[in-house]
Amino acid sequence: MLLVVDVGNTNTVFGIFENGKNVPLFHKRTVTRKDRTSDELGLFFRGFLREFKIENEAITGGIYSSVVPTLNPILERMFQDWFKIEAIRVHYQMKLPFSISYPRPYEIGADRLVNAAACVIDSPGKFIIIDLGTATTFCVVSEKPEYLGGVIAPGLKVSMDALTRNTSQLPPIVFQSPEKILGDSTIESIQAGFFFGWIGLLEGIIREIKKDKGQDYRVIGTGGLVTVIDAAHPGIFDKIDPLLTLRGLQILHQMNS
């Protein structure tokens, strides 16, 4: 079995794949803690595996993507000590199913490489891949396939937290789809501002990318909030795939083993 781990700034998502399968048996999301030791991580993952009656010895492969460099050596030691394997770290110099047209390819986040890999292998074509995470990222992949570049905007939750943290009278809120554009209270007004503001951001950037690159790019959505956005405002995405990153990790492990 294969253990895949995607370490984001806010959340860490991980899953278990049976050898050769491209859909995870199990997956889970947890808060990224930068103060964890390798043993704490090992205990955490062992507990997760035992929920599903899987012993550590069943894990024969590991791969991780990370945008938190300080956690990389901790993860690698965890894989070594607890699973007796050398995990593969995602980076731009590994085998990828696409080329990179980018002056400084080392700047591309590992999560963006993983998402692009999943899209290219799933159904070759032209893609705009949107990941709604701590940051809102747009990645553009041509049909060659070639990674052309992207757009990075603030993440929704980061922006909401910044607003309430830097204002005296605005309360923290939970992001949800409002019933109407005009709020009847402070909370409803903030919810409307963020929801419709983010819809405008997504649609506006997609429009500008298509104006520059062509209209025949498919828009693929992933990330923690993609199902909320798609359910409340369908039509932005041609396809949503909350498990895109995990499947991309499985693909890159297969290519680099």
UniProtKB/Swiss-Prot annotation:
What is its EC class? transferase
Subcellular location as annotated: Cytoplasm
In this chain, substrate is annotated as bound at Y102, G109, A110, D111, R112, T186
Instruction: Specify which residues bind K(+) according to the UniProt entry for this protein.
Output: D131
Q: Which GO cellular component does the record give, naming just one?
A: cytoplasm
The Gene Ontology biological process annotation of the record reads:
coenzyme A biosynthetic process
UniProt cofactor(s): NH4(+); K(+)
Q: Which GO terms describe its molecular function?
A: ATP binding; metal ion binding; pantothenate kinase activity
Q: Which InterPro entries match?
A: ATPase_NBD (IPR043129), Type_III_PanK (IPR004619)
**What domain of life?**
Bacteria
Q: What is the designated name of this protein?
A: Type III pantothenate kinase
Source organism (scientific name): Leptospira borgpetersenii serovar Hardjo-bovis (strain JB197)
